[in-house]
Amino acid sequence: MSLSFCIIVKNEESALPQCLASVRDLVDEMVVLDTGSTDDTIAIAQSFNARIYSFDWCNDFSAARNESLKYVQGDWVLVLDADEVLVPDVIPSLRQAIRSPHHLLINLVRQEVGAAQSPYSMVSRLFRRHPNIRFTRPYHAMVDDSVEMILRHEPDWQIGYLPDVAILHDGYQASTIAARDKFAKARTIMESFLSDHPNDPYVCSKLGALYVEMGAETQGLQLLERGLRSIQNQSQIDAPVLYELHYHLGCVHSEKNSLQAEQHYQLAVQQAILPKLKLGAINNWGNLLKARGDLLGAKALYEQALEIDPALAIAHNNLGMTLKALGQFGDAIAHYKTAIDLQPDYAEAYQNLGVTLLKVGNVAESLSAFRHAIAIYEQTRSPEGDRLRQGLREMGFEL
């Protein structure tokens, strides 16, 4: 089976080399659709022997992606964004997956690099070249809607997934979002789509969560609740979207109504989706219980998160705080150190480690941990560095 790689780009000279290099040894052809680059994007694509086409940007990612599909020639299509890379370890299982004569679509697990709360998502980026597969939705473009229509008429096709992380994505790191004004672009495009599809649960979830992140909490809450009402009225529930709605509603309510937030997190965790995708709700549910004083309940949830993903640094840090509160200082220290090993720039874990080491009388190692925490806080211009330094000064420690 031949595999085509498809990507749309504009001014991606910094990210594109890593993206194309990650798929070079896997795919049979590269199709690059440029939407108006003024930097070295096209030259970089040419250096990878990609076939390059141009498209006038029309504020619609689906339109651009569908244009790129016109040029692919392989039996299967793999789609990435320039700020994504394919994980090398997944290549053998990906090759095996596209040999299946029964599958129309293979969903892939994507990891959001630097995301603490919801590090994983499932994306429909590997699919058979079928004349009726098309992208829909102008911002979060996906083929799911067209695949659903195909299955109604060709029910013998199967949908599969690869359970291991296949894609690494760094486009939602704070620096990238700020540099590209991603929030404003996403808001404009999704609001336009919402005006024509006011009760679409998926866009209600995505745009509602975006409103909350931008500080428009009331507007976001209303949209999330609308999405929840809409999806509950559907004959066939989309479990991943229902999870996201409950997860985001839990986040909104967590500050003012912990019981309502807990109900939403519980319902999110109950959805029939890949366990990795539930980590955000499991971790946040644990935070609610910890804040309420239910330390054993919180401990169980953090341990559940680590059973799913032993490399989840935030769960190690949160479990460390819970164990410290339970008086299990040695175990707490071990989890803080694991969190730091997994995420060396984890200032909060260093700070928590310092507090616990001081508690057990290990002053020298404690001060070393505090110095690391302060240095990281200062690198990120966080006011927590000054607060920590002042707190230590009041205790008689001058760092």
What spans do the regions from the language model cover?
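A conserved acidic beta->alpha catalytic loop
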Residues: 34-46, 57
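Helix-start (N-cap) detector for alpha-helical repeat units in TPR-like alpha-solenoids
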Residues: 201-202, 235, 243, 275-279, ...
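Flexible helix-coil transition and linker loops at the boundaries of alpha-helical arrays
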Residues: 193-196, 228-244, 270-279, 378-380
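Conserved alpha-helical positions within TPR/SEL1-like repeat arrays
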Residues: 205-209, 244-254, 279-290, 314-325, ...
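Catalytic-site signature of metal-activated, phosphate-bearing donor transferases
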Residues: 69, 86-215, 219-222
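Short aromatic/hydrophobic "clamp" motif used to bind/position activated sugar donors
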Residues: 77
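Register position in tetratricopeptide repeats
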Residues: 213, 254-255, 291, 325, ...
